Amino acid sequence: MASTASEIIAFMVSISGWVLVSSTLPTDYWKVSTIDGTVITTATYWANLWKACVTDSTGVSNCKDFPSMLALDGYIQACRGLMIAAVSLGFFGSIFALFGMKCTKVGGSDKAKAKIACLAGIVFILSGLCSMTGCSLYANKITTEFFDPLFVEQKYELGAALFIGWAGASLCIIGGVIFCFSISDNNKTPRYAYNGATSVMSSRTKYHGGEDFKTTNPSKQFDKNAYV
């Protein structure tokens, strides 16, 4: 029962993390920078993995999609690959989890389901690590440019998508670890010492022995009386 409850908790945590990681891909604010006037914000610069935009004080945005993939910076290409890999691994991890959980009717025996659940945990951990690496790589680029005194272009700050990605990656890793530990709970089967058969047999043996003794005595007496 405890193993089933832990698997349900792990599934909910992992799925929540996977949803958060998936939501970072279309999120706009991976990095953001604002130009403030004396009264209002005159412009907001922001970018994600696919485009860079500027929004003026009236709320009108002008966006420019990134050029060909071969012309992109290396860190953007790496972040794209890592985040897409994280989403894909989370999808397969959720399928493995559905087959490996005890509360489902698919997946075979309990032993086979425990192995599938452990595999789902490993896949979720890999998904979380990919997301964590991608967000950290992007954040490292932002902070390096921000604190570089020789960098004269527009400087950005960390956007909301990075924090969402880190949170989702943490949930995926936590859920995957719980899935991996659930296989140890499945292997702990209770052992019982059964000594009832020995006591029953010994009592039966004594009973039959006494019965034989009683039945043999009358036969001997009958024989003696017959000859007399």
UniProtKB/Swiss-Prot annotation:
It is found in: Cell junction, Tight junction; Cell membrane. Residues 102-115, 182-228 are cytoplasmic. It comes from the Eukaryota. GO terms for molecular function: structural molecule activity. It is a multi-pass membrane protein. The chain crosses the membrane at residues 1-21, 81-101, 116-136, 161-181. The keyword Coiled coil does not apply. InterPro entries: Claudin, Claudin10, Claudin_CS, PMP22/EMP/MP20/Claudin. Its main location: other. It catalyses: Na(+)(in) = Na(+)(out); Li(+)(in) = Li(+)(out); K(+)(in) = K(+)(out); Rb(+)(in) = Rb(+)(out). GO terms for cellular component: bicellular tight junction; cytoplasm; plasma membrane. The keyword Ion transport applies. Keywords: Cell junction, Cell membrane, Ion transport, Membrane, Tight junction, Transmembrane, Transmembrane helix, Transport. PROSITE patterns: CLAUDIN (PS01346). One of its GO terms (biological process) is monoatomic ion transport. Residues 22-80, 137-160 are extracellular. The fourth transmembrane region (161-181) is necessary for integration into tight junctions. Belongs to the claudin family. Forms paracellular channels: polymerizes in tight junction strands with cation- and anion-selective channels through the strands, conveying epithelial permeability in a process known as paracellular tight junction permeability. In sweat glands and in the thick ascending limb (TAL) of Henle's loop in kidney, it controls paracellular sodium permeability which is essential for proper sweat production and renal function. In renal proximal tubules, it conveys selective chloride over hydrogencarbonate anion permeability which is required for renal chloride reabsorption and salt homeostasis. Can form homodimers both in trans (interaction between CLDN10 molecules in opposing membranes) and in cis (interaction between CLDN10 molecules within one membrane). Interacts with CLDN19. This is Claudin-10. It comes from Pongo abelii (Sumatran orangutan).
